[in-house]
Amino acid sequence: MDATVFTKCERCKQPVYEKDLRARFNVCPNCEFHYPLPAPERVRLLTDAGSFEERDGELAAGDPLGFEGYPDRLRSARKKTGLGDAILSGVGEIGGRRVALAVMDFRFIGGSMGSVVGERVARTVELARAEGLPLVTVSASGGARMFEGIYSLMQMAKTSVALSRFMEGSKPYISILTDPTFGGVTASFATAADIIIAEPGARVGFAGARVIEQTTKERLPEGFQTAEFQREHGMVDRIVHRLALKGDLERLLGFVG
């Protein structure tokens, strides 16, 4: 991409060089707005250089329900992102400490959790348990993948059972919530951690605010479902700027890893 290309920030509306945005891992240099970050870039941000080894990349989603248009959506998402599904998982080092890591990618069909995403999360958890590693996940998801129906919903149980076994050990599970994290991902592995971190301004919840208001016929509080609101009400432990995440993880792993 041409380094002279500008984009307008979604929040402050100021022009930003694309190269400056990329250099700051998609954080606006003017107002610190956190844009979504592709999974490969997230891995580069969090792990020590050259330490990440992908696992289970061969897994690929099928079309179990014969849902019209789903195979085309999968092909398009794979071409757009270069990923097999909405997740990148494996083993890497953070501050010299080996960890099991699973990172979601919202670009791939809204980061939705289907059978492959759930399986890779579960396998990452099981790997951490088998090898005695700390576990780190990064969520960015609209929820369950409707194209897979009950197969998608089953992933909530699968990941939760894997985590319950992992929690019998002594290694920590750190979950990072990014914008947006919703639906079945929120209701399963994303909020079942020892330590829950969120990026500033991240939207976190189960159903969207508009759906809740239409159902309850009530106006929601200002800032409802933001990371800041969730921290005030006990769902999030800490809010950490994206560019400080690696250092924060290094300190936390030094204490509890």
From Swiss-Prot:
Functional note? Component of the acetyl coenzyme A carboxylase (ACC) complex. Biotin carboxylase (BC) catalyzes the carboxylation of biotin on its carrier protein (BCCP) and then the CO(2) group is transferred by the transcarboxylase to acetyl-CoA to form malonyl-CoA.
Source organism superkingdom = Bacteria
Keywords assigned? ATP-binding, Cytoplasm, Fatty acid biosynthesis, Fatty acid metabolism, Lipid biosynthesis, Lipid metabolism, Metal-binding, Nucleotide-binding, Transferase, Zinc, Zinc-finger
Q: Which organism is it from?
A: Rubrobacter xylanophilus (strain DSM 9941 / JCM 11954 / NBRC 16129 / PRD-1)
The cross-references to PROSITE patterns, in alphabetical order and at most eight, read: COA_CT_NTER
Please list the reactions this protein catalyses: N(6)-carboxybiotinyl-L-lysyl-[protein] + acetyl-CoA = N(6)-biotinyl-L-lysyl-[protein] + malonyl-CoA
**Family statement:** Belongs to the AccD/PCCB family.
Q: Which cofactor does it need?
A: Zn(2+)
The biological pathway it contributes to is: Lipid metabolism; malonyl-CoA biosynthesis; malonyl-CoA from acetyl-CoA: step 1/1
Q: Which GO terms describe its cellular component?
A: acetyl-CoA carboxylase complex
Please state what the protein is called. Acetyl-coenzyme A carboxylase carboxyl transferase subunit beta
- Give the boundaries of each C4-type zinc finger: 9-31
* Quaternary structure and partners: Acetyl-CoA carboxylase is a heterohexamer composed of biotin carboxyl carrier protein (AccB), biotin carboxylase (AccC) and two subunits each of ACCase subunit alpha (AccA) and ACCase subunit beta (AccD).
Taken from the record, one Pfam family name reads: Zn_ribbon_ACC
Instruction: Identify the residues that the record assigns to the CoA carboxyltransferase N-terminal domain, covering every copy.
Output: 5-257
Q: Where in the cell is it found?
A: Cytoplasm
List positions binding Zn(2+): 9, 12, 28, 31
According to its UniProt entry, the protein's GO biological process terms are: fatty acid biosynthetic process; malonyl-CoA biosynthetic process
Molecular function as annotated in GO: acetyl-CoA carboxylase activity; ATP binding; carboxyl- or carbamoyltransferase activity; zinc ion binding
The UniProt entry, under InterPro entries, shows: AcCoA_carboxyl_beta, Acetyl_CoA_COase_Trfase_b_su, ClpP/crotonase-like_dom_sf, COA_CT_N, Znf-ACC
Identify the Gene3D superfamilies for this entry.
2-enoyl-CoA Hydratase, Chain A, domain 1 (3.90.226.10)
Q: What EC number(s) is this enzyme filed under?
A: 2.1.3.15
Q: How is the cofactor bound?
A: Binds 1 zinc ion per subunit.
